[in-house]
Amino acid sequence: MAIPPDIKDSIAKIKPLSQSAVRLMSVMADPDHTVGQIAAIVESDPILTGNVLRVVNSPAFGLRAKISTVSRAVSYTGGNMVVGLALHLCASGIFNHPLEGYESQRGALWRHCLLTAIASREIARFSSGKTDPEVAYTGGLLHDVGKAIMSGSLGNSAREIVAAADAEKTTDFVAGELAAVGTDHTEVGQAIAKHWSLPDPLLEVIRYHHAPSKAHEKYRPLVYAVHLGDFIAMMGGTGTGADTLLYNLDHDYKKFINVSAGELEKVILDSGQEYQQVVESMFGSEEEQQ
């Protein structure tokens, strides 16, 4: 596939991620990272510092005493939420933009990616390979970033793709995107990730989360974790519009994810509960995002 020139131009115009966000993702990719490393990055960014303190002191955390230091705040929020805050601050224009080409509203992409991130992290704990749950979380946050650009190129094609899928004339929404535009949101997403100089594990997740068997063998367990996390999020009611559940579940995930039916059910339940808590702590209520 070759990305059409107009989409390449749109990608080139995307603002770089903040240094804080890039450094946080790099640190989180190291399984031996410390709270101190995360706190040091947050402290170098006044806006991120303010948001981390706002979140940890929100009613959702229910702490009796106010937290006034970043190190203590990070020990409560955890690194995943800090990464989420950093991405939301520097790329909110992408994650909160209405995906009109997918017939979804403002904030739908962020909500879907957030629940995918939480579910992917939990699924990664059952991985048969050396899959870092923290990297799975970040991959989940970013897996559908390509839709922000693809949306404008789809036009009115979404309904045609849905109709074709219903009539079994196309295999899934990715194939429909390719037929309509000449590329798909996974390829566009990977191009955005390269534009942001993101590390290889995240490039693989973004490119192959709908085709995990095609991922590099080294990253395949990670990609399968996000693949399954994506489906959990869609089943949990946080899809991104017309394409929701119009993708194929690769049942080979069982070769990489050793999770029982009961454990999977618990992941789904726990992920949904954590999602609601994160939304409340970050935004006050889900409606405030919309």
Name each region found by the language model.
Residues 1-6, 251-290:
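Terminal helices and disordered tails flanking the catalytic cores of nucleotide-processing hydrolases
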